[in-house]
Amino acid sequence: MDKKEAVINTARDLFQKYGYKKVSMDEIAKTSGVTKKTIYTYFKDKDSMFLYFIEEELQKMKRKIEKKNNSDLPFIEVVATNLYDMLIFRKNSMLISTISKEIKNGNDKCCDFLKVYDDEILSYIEEKINLEIKKGNIKKCDAHLT
């Protein structure tokens, strides 16, 4: 395992176990066996590291959804299944669970992280709706409102 991978795995584990606020860059460095300077060659700060994990979660979810989009199911069934899968994915995500706990404990920074996650999901759904409008599978509408 290379240093970056060690840092990423350690940080992910620590964030999931203790939450965003309680984990320090010092702790990540110590636990992963690298210096803080090494961590800062990979990530600008703790926020950018946490956003990396949010993006990682989003990519996992998108890959799962894309598999269904490429199936022979009717469009409406694909949409319903995708929305359900997104909700289940979010419910079962350790990262989102960690963010939710932080928000309950008054960490406003985590509200921003959750907004990034939610905005990305909404943008993704809107993109898929616009694609289906172009294909003629659904009537023209405001995809953002839909």
Model-identified regions with their sequence ranges:
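Histidine- and aromatic-rich ligand-binding microenvironments
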Residues: 39, 43-44, 49-69, 142
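Helix-turn-helix
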Residues: 6, 10, 14-48, 52
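Hydrophobic alpha-helical connector segments
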Residues: 52, 56, 66-91, 146
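Amphipathic alpha-helical segments used for helix-helix packing
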Residues: 88-109
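Solvent-exposed, non-membrane alpha-helical residues enriched in polar/charged side chains
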Residues: 4, 12, 16, 40, ...
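Hydrophobic alpha-helical segments that form the core
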Residues: 126, 139-146
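Short coil/turn segments at alpha/beta junctions that flank glycine-rich nucleotide-binding fingerprints
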Residues: 17-21, 93, 135
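Amphipathic alpha-helical packing segments from all-alpha helical-bundle domains
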Residues: 108-135
